[in-house]
């Protein structure tokens, strides 16, 4: 069990920022501090993508250091930053012989629910109202997995709000409340102000946006530097093919 002190995330991150630079990034001696930082991320509702992915890559390179509880925490934390690609990246850094363990499979199934924006199913799982089936044979375990991750449900609500902002023009208040897990009127108003929604018909309907009038073209340009490619090549295991 990884031990940490409350409020330790900032100190750990500051130390790790120095320790995981350059060729020292995947030094096995960093494992303990990385695991402590991941535990602090969960309890203090903080997140650092570099630390999360570095920990997973270090486990790949040093299988004897592998800790499933830390991997589970990282996967759950990456779900709190959806619709970002961190969850997909994290899955790619877990070896095939480990990723199908019962607990990790539960997290992956939960991730599938959220990636498909199936908020109705998520809230049933979170509230213990989901009937067991082939996908979730022990649905009560999902709520137990989420409990140690501070702010998990709030992160899902923010994710849902972002999806609503990009897919709806208007939405009935009752439907909005369901998508957000049954929040009260005060919380609905809070999200409406944060995301710029306008209450209409005495609050029965929320105007989200006229997407037809706000369409903008966007070019996505990503550049890979030589140092990026070099680091990947250096840390990629070489496989010998025998024909």
Q: Could you tell me what each predicted segment is?
A:
Residues 1-47, 61-73, 77-243:
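Charged, E/D/K/R/S-rich low-complexity terminal regions of large eukaryotic assembly subunits
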